[in-house]
């Protein structure tokens, strides 16, 4: 009921929280809910991007780091749910959010390890793709076609 609306028309989708636009929205929500100091307060809230949050976090901004903690933990928990029925060898992330590096990866792994069934702990690798986003999508589709 209180979940975020997603661009697909549903509510509560992972995309609404763990995408670049999701990070920007989390920033706006956290700025509105608290009076904690943050570099992000110097910006127009409606124009904040995930890049702004990343820059602030890299400058030691605690609120910006908390935004990535929230996002990464949520994505890590989703990976834990996915592992329960698929037992993947690896989770490979690509796209603009991966430029956040450890700001995102550390909380992803924490969220995963705190949420995943114990039999899956330490089994999956967590990697950032070195491919550009559009290349990854085309190559993934090609690989599926090749197997058919």
Label each region the model flagged:
Residues 2-148:
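ATP-binding/phosphotransfer module of carbohydrate and carboxylate kinases, centering on a glycine-rich
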């Amino acid at each position: 009921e209180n979940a975020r609306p997603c661009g697909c028309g549903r509510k509560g989708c992972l995309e609404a929280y763990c995408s670049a636009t999701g990070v920007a929205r989390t920033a706006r929500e956290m700025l509105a809910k608290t009076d904690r100091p943050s570099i992000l307060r110097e910006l127009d809230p409606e124009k904040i991007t995930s890049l702004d949050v990343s820059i602030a976090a890299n400058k030691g901004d605690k609120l910006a780091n908390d935004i990535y903690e929230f996002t990464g933990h949520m994505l890590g928990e989703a990976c834990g749910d996915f592992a329960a029925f698929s037992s993947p060898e690896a989770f490979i992330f690509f796209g603009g959010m991966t430029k956040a590096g450890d700001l995102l990866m550390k909380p992803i792994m924490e969220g995963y390890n705190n949420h995943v069934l114990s039999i899956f702990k330490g089994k999956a690798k967590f990697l950032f793709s070195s491919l550009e986003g559009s290349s990854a999508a085309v190559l993934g589709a090609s690989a599926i076609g090749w197997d058919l």
